[in-house]
Amino acid sequence: TDVIVAGAVDFPEGKLSLEEKMAEFSRYSEKGFAEIDYTLNQQAIERRDFSAIELEMKTIADFCRENDIRDKAIVEMCKLDGDLAAKKEICQIANRAKPAFLKTSTGRSFGGAKLEDVKLMRQMLTADICIKAAGGIHNYEEAKAFIDAGADALGASAGIAIAEGEPK
């Protein structure tokens, strides 16, 4: 079958320990999940604990590569607004850890995807890391702007409105 199974770990909170997340990833792997979105530890993000963020992202990315799973590491870039250096450091961590995707947001925080974040991510990330823009994408024009800015995938609850808004 061409149907893939996707899931989410620690979504949207980002509160689980790495050990708890890995237990979930193992269960999902055993069940044959092909894609898993997960929220990076938000306390580490807020503290700018880059070593903890890198350990988490690398451990999960390595596991996913070994088990043929596409991982999508969710940052919540809005929590880093006003801290360009932190946003760049997250991108450098991703370049070393190599998740399949770096995702802007859960779409459930106080801020969703922002064009300037996607542009920065595309500028900073190596070509083998995909970008998923999620949260606050409501129509075709916004969706196209995020794709033009460098997003490889979109997360939006307005998928039908986006598709129906495409100019004919």
Question: Predicted segment positions?
Answer:
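Glycine-rich tight-turn/loop motif centered on a GG-T
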Residues: 11-18, 40-52
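Short acidic/polar alpha-helix capping motifs at helix-coil junctions
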Residues: 23-24, 53-57, 83, 108-109
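Glycine-rich phosphate-binding active-site loops on the catalytic face of alpha/beta enzymes
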Residues: 31-45, 96-111, 135-168
